[in-house]
Amino acid sequence: MKLSLSVALSLAASTAQAATQFCDQWGSVTEGNYILYNNLWGQAQATSGSQCTTFESLSGNTIVWNTKWSWSGGQGQVKSFANAALQFTPKKLSSVKSIDSTWKWNYSGSNIVADVAYDMFLSTSPGGDHNYEIMVWLGALGGAGPISSTGSPIATPTVAGIKFNLYLGPNGSMQVYSFVAQSTTNSFSGDMRDFFTYLESNQGLSSDLYLVDVQAGTEPFSGSNAVFTVSDYSVSVA
Protein backbone atom coordinates (compact mmCIF):
# COMPACT_ATOMS: atom_id res chain seq x y z
CA MET A 1 0.00 0.00 0.00
CA LYS A 2 1.38 3.40 -0.96
CA LEU A 3 1.28 6.27 1.50
CA SER A 4 1.20 9.96 0.75
CA LEU A 5 4.26 11.95 1.82
CA SER A 6 2.30 13.75 4.55
CA VAL A 7 1.01 10.48 5.99
CA ALA A 8 4.48 8.93 5.85
CA LEU A 9 6.00 11.90 7.64
CA SER A 10 3.25 11.77 10.26
CA LEU A 11 3.92 8.10 10.89
CA ALA A 12 7.65 8.74 11.12
CA ALA A 13 7.07 11.49 13.67
CA SER A 14 4.81 9.22 15.70
CA THR A 15 7.45 6.50 15.66
CA ALA A 16 10.12 8.95 16.84
CA GLN A 17 7.91 9.99 19.74
CA ALA A 18 6.96 6.46 20.82
CA ALA A 19 7.52 5.87 24.53
CA THR A 20 10.61 3.80 25.30
CA GLN A 21 11.08 2.01 28.63
CA PHE A 22 14.31 0.41 29.83
CA CYS A 23 15.03 -1.36 33.11
CA ASP A 24 18.59 -2.67 32.79
CA GLN A 25 21.34 -1.24 34.98
CA TRP A 26 23.05 0.85 32.32
CA GLY A 27 20.09 1.28 29.96
CA SER A 28 19.85 4.51 27.99
CA VAL A 29 18.22 6.12 24.98
CA THR A 30 19.36 9.11 22.91
CA GLU A 31 16.73 11.66 21.95
CA GLY A 32 17.62 15.01 20.41
CA ASN A 33 20.38 16.66 22.45
CA TYR A 34 19.85 14.34 25.43
CA ILE A 35 20.89 10.90 26.59
CA LEU A 36 18.37 9.54 29.09
CA TYR A 37 19.93 7.09 31.54
CA ASN A 38 18.54 4.54 34.02
CA ASN A 39 21.95 4.37 35.76
CA LEU A 40 21.51 1.93 38.65
CA TRP A 41 25.07 2.56 39.78
CA GLY A 42 24.41 1.90 43.49
CA GLN A 43 21.93 -0.98 43.25
CA ALA A 44 24.38 -3.35 44.98
CA GLN A 45 23.82 -1.35 48.18
CA ALA A 46 20.12 -2.36 48.23
CA THR A 47 18.77 -5.55 49.77
CA SER A 48 15.99 -5.51 47.17
CA GLY A 49 14.54 -3.24 44.53
CA SER A 50 14.19 -2.34 40.89
CA GLN A 51 13.85 0.66 38.63
CA CYS A 52 12.62 1.40 35.11
CA THR A 53 12.98 4.67 33.21
CA THR A 54 10.73 5.77 30.35
CA PHE A 55 11.28 8.34 27.63
CA GLU A 56 7.90 9.84 26.80
CA SER A 57 8.39 12.62 24.25
CA LEU A 58 10.63 15.32 22.84
CA SER A 59 9.40 18.65 21.49
CA GLY A 60 12.12 21.00 20.33
CA ASN A 61 14.60 20.99 23.21
CA THR A 62 12.04 19.92 25.83
CA ILE A 63 12.11 16.30 27.00
CA VAL A 64 9.38 14.50 28.99
CA TRP A 65 10.29 11.36 30.92
CA ASN A 66 9.72 9.39 34.11
CA THR A 67 11.29 6.76 36.31
CA LYS A 68 9.58 4.26 38.61
CA TRP A 69 11.41 2.53 41.43
CA SER A 70 11.30 0.68 44.73
CA TRP A 71 14.46 0.31 46.83
CA SER A 72 15.03 -1.02 50.34
CA GLY A 73 18.11 -1.58 52.48
CA GLY A 74 21.42 0.25 52.35
CA GLN A 75 20.26 3.12 54.51
CA GLY A 76 21.80 6.43 53.49
CA GLN A 77 23.18 4.99 50.24
CA VAL A 78 22.16 6.27 46.79
CA LYS A 79 20.90 3.43 44.59
CA SER A 80 20.73 5.11 41.18
CA PHE A 81 20.65 8.34 39.21
CA ALA A 82 18.06 8.30 36.45
CA ASN A 83 18.89 11.45 34.51
CA ALA A 84 18.76 13.38 31.27
CA ALA A 85 22.30 14.32 30.21
CA LEU A 86 22.88 17.12 27.72
CA GLN A 87 25.18 16.43 24.78
CA PHE A 88 27.39 19.45 24.13
CA THR A 89 30.99 20.42 23.45
CA PRO A 90 32.90 21.14 26.69
CA LYS A 91 33.59 24.84 27.23
CA LYS A 92 35.70 26.87 29.62
CA LEU A 93 33.57 28.57 32.24
CA SER A 94 35.00 31.88 31.07
CA SER A 95 33.35 31.21 27.69
CA VAL A 96 30.01 30.01 29.05
CA LYS A 97 27.55 32.89 28.80
CA SER A 98 24.42 31.06 29.91
CA ILE A 99 23.00 27.66 30.87
CA ASP A 100 19.29 28.36 30.51
CA SER A 101 17.02 25.66 31.90
CA THR A 102 13.43 24.89 32.80
CA TRP A 103 12.32 21.93 34.90
CA LYS A 104 8.93 20.80 36.15
CA TRP A 105 8.73 17.58 38.14
CA ASN A 106 6.62 15.64 40.60
CA TYR A 107 7.10 12.69 42.96
CA SER A 108 4.63 10.15 44.32
CA GLY A 109 5.08 6.96 46.33
CA SER A 110 5.59 5.68 49.86
CA ASN A 111 8.34 6.58 52.34
CA ILE A 112 10.41 8.28 49.66
CA VAL A 113 13.94 9.30 50.54
CA ALA A 114 15.47 10.90 47.46
CA ASP A 115 16.87 14.06 45.98
CA VAL A 116 15.99 15.83 42.74
CA ALA A 117 19.03 17.59 41.38
CA TYR A 118 21.10 19.05 38.60
CA ASP A 119 24.51 17.40 38.51
CA MET A 120 27.27 19.27 36.68
CA PHE A 121 30.96 18.49 36.37
CA LEU A 122 34.09 20.55 35.82
CA SER A 123 37.52 19.46 34.64
CA THR A 124 40.91 21.06 34.03
CA SER A 125 40.74 19.83 30.42
CA PRO A 126 37.93 19.06 27.94
CA GLY A 127 38.45 15.29 28.17
CA GLY A 128 40.04 14.99 31.59
CA ASP A 129 38.90 13.52 34.88
CA HIS A 130 36.25 15.38 36.83
CA ASN A 131 37.72 17.77 39.40
CA TYR A 132 34.56 19.43 40.70
CA GLU A 133 30.96 18.34 40.98
CA ILE A 134 28.32 21.06 41.29
CA MET A 135 24.91 19.84 42.43
CA VAL A 136 21.75 21.93 42.65
CA TRP A 137 19.10 20.15 44.70
CA LEU A 138 15.59 21.36 43.96
CA GLY A 139 14.21 18.71 46.31
CA ALA A 140 15.58 16.90 49.38
CA LEU A 141 12.82 14.44 50.19
CA GLY A 142 12.42 12.32 53.32
CA GLY A 143 15.59 13.55 54.98
CA ALA A 144 17.97 13.02 52.05
CA GLY A 145 21.21 14.90 52.59
CA PRO A 146 24.18 15.95 50.43
CA ILE A 147 27.88 15.15 50.64
CA SER A 148 29.36 17.32 53.38
CA SER A 149 32.60 17.37 55.35
CA THR A 150 30.92 18.86 58.41
CA GLY A 151 27.18 18.25 58.04
CA SER A 152 26.60 21.99 58.15
CA PRO A 153 26.22 24.51 55.31
CA ILE A 154 29.18 26.74 54.50
CA ALA A 155 26.86 29.49 53.21
CA THR A 156 23.18 30.27 52.63
CA PRO A 157 23.07 32.02 49.25
CA THR A 158 20.10 33.11 47.19
CA VAL A 159 20.64 32.11 43.56
CA ALA A 160 18.12 32.35 40.71
CA GLY A 161 15.63 33.72 43.23
CA ILE A 162 15.80 30.61 45.45
CA LYS A 163 17.29 30.33 48.94
CA PHE A 164 19.83 27.51 49.28
CA ASN A 165 22.05 25.91 51.87
CA LEU A 166 25.48 25.35 50.33
CA TYR A 167 27.51 22.29 51.38
CA LEU A 168 31.05 21.22 50.52
CA GLY A 169 32.64 17.78 50.75
CA PRO A 170 34.77 15.22 48.89
CA ASN A 171 33.62 12.52 46.50
CA GLY A 172 36.76 10.55 45.79
CA SER A 173 39.22 13.02 44.28
CA MET A 174 36.48 15.54 43.46
CA GLN A 175 35.28 18.45 45.52
CA VAL A 176 31.48 18.60 45.60
CA TYR A 177 29.50 21.79 46.05
CA SER A 178 25.83 21.09 46.76
CA PHE A 179 23.24 23.86 46.65
CA VAL A 180 20.23 22.45 48.54
CA ALA A 181 17.00 24.43 48.20
CA GLN A 182 15.58 25.39 51.59
CA SER A 183 12.09 24.65 50.23
CA THR A 184 11.18 22.04 47.62
CA THR A 185 11.05 23.64 44.17
CA ASN A 186 8.89 21.63 41.76
CA SER A 187 9.05 24.22 38.99
CA PHE A 188 12.30 25.94 38.05
CA SER A 189 13.23 28.36 35.30
CA GLY A 190 16.56 30.12 35.35
CA ASP A 191 20.18 30.36 34.29
CA MET A 192 22.36 27.65 35.84
CA ARG A 193 25.40 29.80 35.01
CA ASP A 194 24.46 31.87 38.07
CA PHE A 195 25.55 29.05 40.38
CA PHE A 196 29.03 28.99 38.87
CA THR A 197 29.21 32.79 39.02
CA TYR A 198 28.42 32.61 42.73
CA LEU A 199 31.17 30.03 43.32
CA GLU A 200 33.67 32.07 41.30
CA SER A 201 32.89 35.20 43.32
CA ASN A 202 32.54 33.62 46.77
CA GLN A 203 34.42 30.29 46.81
CA GLY A 204 37.37 30.97 44.52
CA LEU A 205 36.25 28.62 41.75
CA SER A 206 38.44 29.09 38.67
CA SER A 207 36.84 30.25 35.42
CA ASP A 208 39.58 28.35 33.56
CA LEU A 209 37.86 25.05 34.38
CA TYR A 210 35.89 23.30 31.64
CA LEU A 211 32.19 22.55 31.94
CA VAL A 212 32.03 18.96 30.70
CA ASP A 213 28.71 17.48 31.91
CA VAL A 214 25.22 18.81 32.62
CA GLN A 215 22.74 16.25 33.95
CA ALA A 216 19.43 16.43 35.79
CA GLY A 217 17.49 13.69 37.52
CA THR A 218 16.80 11.94 40.81
CA GLU A 219 18.90 9.99 43.30
CA PRO A 220 16.78 7.56 45.34
CA PHE A 221 17.94 6.26 48.70
CA SER A 222 14.86 4.21 49.64
CA GLY A 223 11.10 4.01 49.23
CA SER A 224 8.44 2.00 47.44
CA ASN A 225 6.17 2.44 44.44
CA ALA A 226 7.90 5.71 43.64
CA VAL A 227 7.06 7.55 40.44
CA PHE A 228 9.25 10.50 39.46
CA THR A 229 7.65 12.42 36.61
CA VAL A 230 9.39 15.09 34.55
CA SER A 231 6.70 16.95 32.62
CA ASP A 232 9.02 19.64 31.22
CA TYR A 233 12.82 19.72 31.08
CA SER A 234 15.15 21.69 28.87
CA VAL A 235 18.68 23.00 29.12
CA SER A 236 21.16 24.59 26.73
CA VAL A 237 24.74 25.81 27.05
CA ALA A 238 25.69 29.02 25.25
Swiss-Prot record:
* Family matches, as InterPro entries: ConA-like_dom_sf, GH11/12, GH12
Kindly state a single biological-process term from the GO annotations of this entry. cell wall organization
Which GO cellular component terms, listed alphabetically, does the Swiss-Prot or TrEMBL entry include? extracellular region
Pfam families found in the cross-reference section: Glyco_hydro_12
Q: Which residues form the signal peptide?
A: 1-18
Give the sugar-modified residues: 106, 171
Keyword annotations from UniProtKB, A to Z: Carbohydrate metabolism, Cell wall biogenesis/degradation, Glycoprotein, Glycosidase, Hydrolase, Polysaccharide degradation, Secreted, Signal
What GO MF annotations does this protein's record show?
Answer: cellulase activity; hydrolase activity, acting on glycosyl bonds; xyloglucan-specific endo-beta-1,4-glucanase activity
What exactly does this protein do? Catalyzes endohydrolysis of 1,4-beta-D-glucosidic linkages in xyloglucan with retention of the beta-configuration of the glycosyl residues. Specific for xyloglucan and does not hydrolyze other cell wall components.
Annotated family: Belongs to the glycosyl hydrolase 12 (cellulase H) family.
Name of the protein in question: Probable xyloglucan-specific endo-beta-1,4-glucanase A
Recorded source organism is Aspergillus fumigatus (strain ATCC MYA-4609 / CBS 101355 / FGSC A1100 / Af293)
Question: What would be the name of the gene that encodes this protein?
Answer: xgeA
